[in-house]
């Protein structure tokens, strides 16, 4: 019984390709997330104050945010254009990846007076939805604790100006906030 070289070659090739497909499938989430690293840092741990940390955000929050960017309903400098370049499947892959990353706190200078005022504002206006000091990773309302202060201020200014969609219960709370409380 002779060995068919074509059949053997096909078998070896298919085994190799199956292995390569597995490697690519395992890396695809990380590779997709790396496309965000320029602004949002490696594994979603932002290195700069203009971009939020993505590490630990819930899948639904990430998906909803990217959908809003794609549809042009969330203000952005470039994210509206970037989001349009991803398929829904790619966005879901990135959402799963970032949700699985540990929450990373931005390195911000500590100002005791500002921290105290921020805690009071949080307790009064934010705690019902942004659980555990705003740091609950699975919270679909988004992570507040550990985000860059300039990014939080930009976001709150967008909410306050009506430039960004938000739940009605949040709109009621944001409307009551003074500019000083937002800072």
Where are these regions (language model features)?
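Sequence/structural segment immediately N-terminal to covalent heme-attachment motifs in c-type
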Residues: 24-43, 106, 110-133, 148-150, ...
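C-terminal capping alpha-helices of c-type cytochrome domains
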Residues: 84-106, 150, 173-183
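Extracytoplasmic/secreted proteins, especially bacterial periplasmic and envelope-associated proteins
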Residues: 31, 35, 61-64, 78-81, ...
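Interdomain hinge/lid region at the active-site interface
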Residues: 166
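Cleavable N-terminal signal peptides
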Residues: 12-13, 23-24
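Gly/Gly-Pro-rich "capping" loops immediately C-terminal to redox-active cysteine motifs
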Residues: 44-75, 80-86, 119, 131-160
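Bacterial N-terminal signal peptides that target proteins for export
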Residues: 2-11
């Amino acid at each position: 019984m002779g060995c068919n070289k074509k059949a053997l070659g096909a078998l070896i090739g298919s085994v190799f390709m199956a292995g390569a497909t597995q490697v690519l499938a395992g890396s695809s989430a990380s590779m997709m997330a790396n496309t965000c690293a320029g602004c949002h840092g490696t594994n979603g741990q932002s290195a700069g104050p203009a971009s939020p940390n993505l590490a630990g955000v819930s899948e639904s929050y990430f998906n909803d945010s990217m959908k809003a960017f794609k549809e042009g309903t969330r203000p952005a400098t470039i994210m509206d254009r970037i989001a349009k370049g991803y398929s829904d499947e790619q966005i879901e892959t990135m959402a799963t990846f970032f949700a699985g990353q540990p929450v990373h706190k931005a390195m911000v200078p500590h100002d005791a007076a500002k921290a105290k005022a921020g805690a009071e504002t949080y307790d009064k206006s934010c705690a019902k939805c942004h659980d555990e000091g705003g740091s609950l990773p699975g919270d679909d309302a988004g992570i507040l604790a550990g985000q860059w202060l300039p990014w939080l201020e930009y976001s709150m200014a967008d909410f306050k100006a009506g430039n960004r969609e938000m739940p009605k219960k949040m709109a009621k709370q944001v409307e009551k906030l003074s500019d000083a409380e937002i800072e």
